């Protein structure tokens, strides 16, 4: 059986990984083995944090809606319950944007729902 040295294919693979790690600090961008490990770690973190971002943004929207609702004398819990009761549940992201950008519109929404 003949020996396979993998010449340019191995070089191409290493260059690709080092190019991915080019923005990393210190040896993590210079040495292949550490760059390879850091690439795996970076991709794991990116995958985990894509799910975490969804959770964090939902918490932020709920906090903003709660703050705006309490300024109008209603808790978040009651506000959402009335929205469900009237079958008007809108997107929490949209409600949070309305609460932040247009306070008068949000207060009219609350007044119309809670009657």
UniProtKB/Swiss-Prot annotation:
<keyword id="KW-0699">rRNA-binding</keyword>
<keyword id="KW-0694">RNA-binding</keyword>
<dbReference type="InterPro" id="IPR049946">
    <property type="entry name" value="RIBOSOMAL_L20_CS"/>
</dbReference>
<keyword id="KW-0934">Plastid</keyword>
<dbReference type="Pfam" id="PF00453">
    <property type="entry name" value="Ribosomal_L20"/>
</dbReference>
<keyword id="KW-0150">Chloroplast</keyword>
<dbReference type="GO" id="GO:0019843">
    <property type="term" value="F:rRNA binding"/>
</dbReference>
<keyword id="KW-0687">Ribonucleoprotein</keyword>
<comment type="function">
    <text>Binds directly to 23S ribosomal RNA and is necessary for the in vitro assembly process of the 50S ribosomal subunit. It is not involved in the protein synthesizing functions of that subunit.</text>
</comment>
<protein>
    <recommendedName>
        <fullName>Large ribosomal subunit protein bL20c</fullName>
    </recommendedName>
</protein>
<dbReference type="InterPro" id="IPR035566">
    <property type="entry name" value="Ribosomal_protein_bL20_C"/>
</dbReference>
<dbReference type="GO" id="GO:0006412">
    <property type="term" value="P:translation"/>
</dbReference>
<dbReference type="GO" id="GO:0003735">
    <property type="term" value="F:structural constituent of ribosome"/>
</dbReference>
<keyword id="KW-0689">Ribosomal protein</keyword>
<dbReference type="GO" id="GO:1990904">
    <property type="term" value="C:ribonucleoprotein complex"/>
</dbReference>
<comment type="similarity">
    <text>Belongs to the bacterial ribosomal protein bL20 family.</text>
</comment>
<dbReference type="GO" id="GO:0005840">
    <property type="term" value="C:ribosome"/>
</dbReference>
<dbReference type="GO" id="GO:0009507">
    <property type="term" value="C:chloroplast"/>
</dbReference>
<dbReference type="InterPro" id="IPR005813">
    <property type="entry name" value="Ribosomal_bL20"/>
</dbReference>
<dbReference type="GO" id="GO:0000027">
    <property type="term" value="P:ribosomal large subunit assembly"/>
</dbReference>
């Amino acid at each position: 059986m003949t020996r396979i040295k993998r010449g340019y294919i191995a070089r191409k693979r290493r260059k690709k990984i080092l190019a991915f790690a080019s923005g990393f600090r210190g040896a993590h961008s210079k040495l292949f083995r550490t760059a390879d490990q850091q690439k795996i770690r970076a991709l794991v973190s990116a995958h985990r944090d894509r799910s975490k971002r969804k959770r964090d943004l939902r918490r932020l929207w709920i906090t903003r809606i709660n703050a705006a609702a309490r300024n109008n004398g209603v808790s978040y819990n009651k506000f959402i319950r009335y929205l469900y009761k009237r079958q008007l549940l809108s997107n929490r992201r949209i409600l949070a944007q309305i609460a932040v950008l247009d306070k008068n519109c949000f207060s009219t929404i609350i007044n119309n729902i809670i009657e």
